[in-house]
Amino acid sequence: MSTAGLLLAAGAGRRYGMPKALAQAPGGAELLVQRALRTLREGGCDPVVVVLGAGAEQAPPLPGAQVVVNEDWPTGMGSSLRAGLDALPEEVTAVVVLLVDTPGVTPQAVRRIAADARATTLRVATYSGDGGHPVLLGRDHWDGASRLAVGDVGARPYLVSQLVEEVPCDDIAIGTDLDTPPDLRDSDA
């Protein structure tokens, strides 16, 4: 039994002006895709699948990750979620899904979401009571999440149709996503 990480990093970042995966993370020492990969690895996820799309050819090497290029990335996050879930090995019991534009999510939040995960587990991190990332999908939920994942809403249609365990993460992470360069500049991550 293992818990994998799934990093969704395929979007063009239209509001951001470039693929967010290739943007500098707060602090400037690494790109957002590298920060998020490190967060999943340090959070105990193994293996980690990174789904790239827009700008994939410009991405740096991502040691410790299986990179999947989603050629359908213009259709939205749903196709990236499906591509990532399809790439996971059979022995994986659950997967922690993280978005590349949430650099305030910490390895501690990943560990909290992933604790004692089973194939039946379905969890979402909350910040001030609102759902965010990471999200944990036990293997029993992959088919349903894949079927309902359309456009840029990812697994949300599936999550709202299920009983989801909410896991408060306010004390160890910042769940805000970055949509524009000023968001990054103003980030506390």
Language-model features: locations:
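Hydrophobic, well-ordered secondary-structure segments
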Residues: 86, 141, 145-146, 153
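A residue-level structural signature of the nucleotidyltransferase/glycosyltransferase Rossmann-like core
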Residues: 102, 133-136, 147, 175-176
